[in-house]
Amino acid sequence: MTSLHQVLYFIFFASVSSECVTKVFKDISFQGGDLSTVFTPSATYCRLVCTHHPRCLLFTFMAESSSDDPTKWFACILKDSVTEILPMVNMTGAISGYSFKQCPQQLSTCSKDVYVNLDMKGMNYNSSVVKNARECQERCTDDAHCQFFTYATGYFPSVDHRKMCLLKYTRTGTPTTITKLNGVVSGFSLKSCGLSNLACIRDIFPNTVLADLNIDSVVAPDAFVCRRICTHHPTCLFFTFFSQAWPKESQRHLCLLKTSESGLPSTRITKSHALSGFSLQHCRHSVPVFCHPSFYNDTDFLGEELDIVDVKGQETCQKTCTNNARCQFFTYYPSHRLCNERNRRGRCYLKLSSNGSPTRILHGRGGISGYSLRLCKMDNVCTTKINPRVVGGAASVHGEWPWQVTLHISQGHLCGGSIIGNQWILTAAHCFSGIETPKKLRVYGGIVNQSEINEGTAFFRVQEMIIHDQYTTAESGYDIALLKLESAMNYTDFQRPICLPSKGDRNAVHTECWVTGWGYTALRGEVQSTLQKAKVPLVSNEECQTRYRRHKITNKMICAGYKEGGKDTCKGDSGGPLSCKYNGVWHLVGITSWGEGCGQKERPGVYTNVAKYVDWILEKTQTV
């Protein structure tokens, strides 16, 4: 007979199953709905695996001593349910909970924890003697194939194996089993933390097929989505994508995930309509989120249909998919009926598949397709979210713009800047006119009021200034510079990086952009003590050029401001960010560079177009 305790739990979950449930339930097991079983060292890691699994909504983790059979310890059972709920039963040692797919908080794939006296089993393919577990984890992070490791400490029973570091991998990226073993420490690679020193190759190579081992294949609308899938696949190191124009129809939109023993492609074959590239899992500072935000016009995604709803516009269709815990992708058909345009609704088809990708992609049927944005909120270190000097600006509050820093020289505010990595600040080159050495510079993070800064305020010293070698004046372009800090900063709610723009989102339409800084609020005003903010619209380069006929507005610049004036950056805001929110993630779209006056009518502010310098930024931050 079902206990009252179980019935109450069932009613509770029935009311919140489509919402965020963060609580875990000890000595409770979900019954049925099994998708697969993996092994994880903790319930927290089990939830992480569930969250990033394409279909997992619930999980049950079998803790140590949960069974008389030790081979069942540390089992992580991934589950799904059409109703998003499952019945629960009492089970000693079981820990159950929900995926974080529907939760607003950030959940990183990064796991820095190490597990004492646990041996995570896998394919042992490399062994070496190292000083400690930290060095072993670093070796794993800097090895292309390594997913996790086990280190034998100085207390390991076998003297011959002490200080031994074993690098491991499996097909799934999780251990095949986990056992208790005294004197060892196990943990995971920190590649997903953005801490690998391996080469990061961001180029996508057209007309190229990589002829190496295919470990998996999925259907994708373009090479950028294919690359993101490869990046978050446990064993993919590089890929080949066949475009819509590929001659063999059955292979169009096919994304081939690949690996090799050496970690690099062995053979490149030139073929039209194929594109190839590399996983970005190795990229230091900025492993991309598993998120596909774009819309694909005249494109139908095929898959298992979950629901059909009438909505107004593809954005609403995408939001409906995102709010449905099981929806992975969608196709929206606009209405062509003769009716009031303002009330016209189209049909939104919510869909899913076993691997989270369409089973097939078709064109020419009038659909607009895209993906759920539910994983766009996952934390890749820089996916900072906030709630919403600036001439016409308003005062900011602590934690609202955590990437904004103030650069000081001679105990006074010089310029603004943006945190893009734990040792890197991006700012404007013109800020350093006449400054020969970085030794006098101070960088303050987490500051809202300049009056807060005194001799006891913590700051970062600058190790190196890197100014673009083509910079001459702000008006001529290339107004961009990097500061490398002497020591790495710790990220907090008040001091975090902002994401760089993605090449894959180069056609993104930014409708929510803000400028921030401590500059003058009028041309002859006073420097502001409190960080100012103002929302500004972007202005096309063509229109901006008509406002500045004496200057050349290039594609390496971007303009923003109101036609009537009133809100703009001003002297003292230089180097600060033009931050734009796109699909819930803030991106550094511009760097405050130059303009005429402050908030003058028909004189928009001119900013360095960061998207045009991403390759330069990555080159400098990864080689210095």
From Swiss-Prot:
Q: Name the enzyme group at the top EC level.
A: hydrolase
Sites where a glycan is attached: N90, N126, N297, N449, N490
Q: What is its main location?
A: secreted
- Give the active-site positions: H430 (charge relay system), D479 (charge relay system), S574 (charge relay system)
One annotated Gene Ontology cellular component of this protein: extracellular space
SUPFAM superfamilies, per database record: Trypsin-like serine proteases
Q: Please list the residue ranges annotated as the Peptidase S1 domain.
A: 390-622
Catalysed reaction per UniProt? Answer: Selective cleavage of Arg-|-Ala and Arg-|-Val bonds in factor IX to form factor IXa
**What is the protein name given in its UniProt record?**
Coagulation factor XI
Species per Swiss-Prot/TrEMBL record: Mus musculus (Mouse)
